[in-house]
């Protein structure tokens, strides 16, 4: 019985130890979200971009640029899209004061519908006001002319 208990405890510890999948920058970024001494400021070049008109079946990338206008490192700690037709990527390393970062939204019109579209990307940062930012892109999808 003691051997079974000991084996179970070792197995449980092994599984929980393997669950730590956060990188060092994620750990630092997440702790910066809660530590007011690490708050900084961000300025977005654009928070609304109209990409114009594309054909159904086309894919595009919309780029949102930000600048760290504070005096502490800026962390984009979470970026998520409003739907499955948009896949976001972003600067995952610390953005030092005065430097620029990027959020890119890759949009696949095959996963959407013809007509006007309005898509959003949500960004969480280590800034005191407006910790969550909403980046929006709009445009029109048309059926290609045969």
Segments predicted by a language model, with ranges:
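Positively charged n-region of N-terminal signal peptides that target proteins for export
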Residues: 1-4
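C-terminal motif of bacterial Sec signal peptides marking the signal peptidase cleavage site
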Residues: 14-17
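Long, low-complexity ectodomains and other extracytoplasmic segments of secretory-pathway proteins
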Residues: 19-54, 128-146
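Short strand-edge motifs at loop-to-beta-strand transitions and within beta-strands
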Residues: 49, 99-105
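Short, solvent-exposed loop/turn segments enriched in Ser/Thr/Gly
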Residues: 56-63, 114-120
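Asparagine-centered strand-capping/turn motif at beta-strand->loop junctions
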Residues: 66-70
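Surface-exposed binding patches on compact interaction domains or structured appendages
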Residues: 71-99
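Short, surface-exposed loop/turn segments at beta-strand-coil junctions that are enriched for proline
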Residues: 108-114
């Amino acid at each position: 019985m003691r051997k079974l208990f000991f084996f179970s405890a070792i197995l449980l510890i092994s599984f929980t130890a393997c669950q730590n999948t956060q990188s060092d920058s994620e750990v630092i970024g997440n702790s910066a979200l809660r530590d007011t001494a690490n708050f900084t400021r961000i300025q977005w070049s654009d928070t609304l971009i109209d990409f114009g008109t594309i054909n159904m079946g086309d894919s595009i990338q919309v780029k949102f640029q930000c600048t760290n206008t504070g005096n502490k490192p800026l962390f984009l700690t979470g970026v998520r899209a409003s739907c499955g037709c948009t896949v976001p990527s972003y600067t995952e390393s610390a953005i030092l004061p005065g430097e620029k970062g990027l959020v890119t939204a890759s949009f696949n019109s095959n996963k959407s519908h013809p007509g006007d579209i309005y898509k959003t990307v949500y960004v969480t940062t280590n800034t005191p006001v407006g910790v969550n930012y909403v980046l929006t892109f709009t445009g029109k999808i048309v059926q290609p002319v045969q």
